[in-house]
Amino acid sequence: MSTEKKLRFETLQLHVGQENPDPATDARAVPIYQTTSYVFRNSQHAADRFGLRDAGNIYGRLTNSTQGVFEDRVAALEGGVAGLAVASGAAAVTYALQNILQNGDHIVAADNIYGGTYNLITHTLSTQGVSYTIVNPRNFEQVEAAIQDNTKALYAETFGNPNSDVTDIDKLAEIAHRHNIPLIIDNTFGTPYLIRPIEHGADIVVHSATKFIGGHGSSLGGVIVDGGKFDWKANADKFPTLAKPAPSYHGAVFADVAGAAAFVTRIRAVILRDTGATISPFNAWILLQGLETLSLRVERHVQNALKVVEYLEKNPKVAKVNHPAVPSHPDHELYKKLFPNGGGSIFTFDIKGGEKEAWEFIDHLRIFSLLANVADVKSLVIHPATTTHSQLSPEELEEQHIYPSTVRLSIGIENIDDLIEALDEAFTYVK
């Protein structure tokens, strides 16, 4: 019987992918392998690598050893079988969808997703022959009714953007699997420290690693994690890209070649090969530095956020706080169930008044930076209706509960008293 013990999250985030020192140099820190290409031992070795018969480095567009450590570590933290790092979160989402969606296919997506992903689905993919249905993820009957014969995926986020709505992943997974389609979950705002969607039935998890994983607003990156549980071959006609012969690999079937890791293997071998949204070794290394302190930072983010929510709830100039920790929030009970340690450091509130009052508050808010990123160690603020979600129509904004009075906060890890004082001061400018 094995005596090997299962390591816990805080240990995994430091050691996976480099359990021993670097074999070439004995360096304890993960090296930056700043190279474009790799030497093959002989011609047969090169042919086996290109033919997917031997796993390993081929060319820098596809793999890199620094990148590999990062991929393995995120996959382990999420409880997946394999990971793929790419140049940005947007690339991760795009590749995950393109991997199974073809001309004539259909996707069902939640209505509270990130504005960029919403545009990808409703505008960009739709020009490529992919139809869509946008649904309220709380309305399970609506979700199920939206699934068609040509539906290839159900897509949602752990926490909605920007209002921090909570997704019932277990229920969506049940619906998706009843119709033999995968559930793809963006866990950027949840982080694997607070929730692991694969354990709740998700099949594929995507991240903008730019956010909590990196944590410092310094590097772009995205990650796709393969849960390894969806049976692509049992649904071969629905998922030919994974379960039928691949023309550019002489008829190889990814579900056979890569087994449980078929999903990310095909993205790497086909989509990344052909379109090249490659993460740089340096960015992968920077994101690894962030990953090593993920649990510590997220704990502080959550502590501060809950105190800010409490403060805003009592502020007479605030009309509503959109956070599931608030007892009156429709997702409050689900939030307590899925996030016993809290969560949701990115959320919105509606100021009394409208755009004028929201802008007045934002423009006088110290410490908080006015920018489009979130999940930085530094606190951030923005007006979603005129920035991150400005591509949406007035009707779409209202459907997502984003109003002229809505302000989005991303709470950092500063001293909470300093943050409360800054908020209090900014409210004095709102008449």
Residue ranges: model-predicted function:
Residues 2-64, 72-73:
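N-terminal "arm"/small-domain region of PLP-dependent enzymes with the aminotransferase-like
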Residues 42-91, 116-124:
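Conserved N-terminal alpha-helix of the aminotransferase class I/II PLP-enzyme fold
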Residues 159, 188-190, 326, 352, ...:
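Active-site beta-loop-alpha junctions enriched in small/polar residues
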Residues 225, 348-350, 410-412:
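Short hydrophobic/aromatic beta-strand micro-patches
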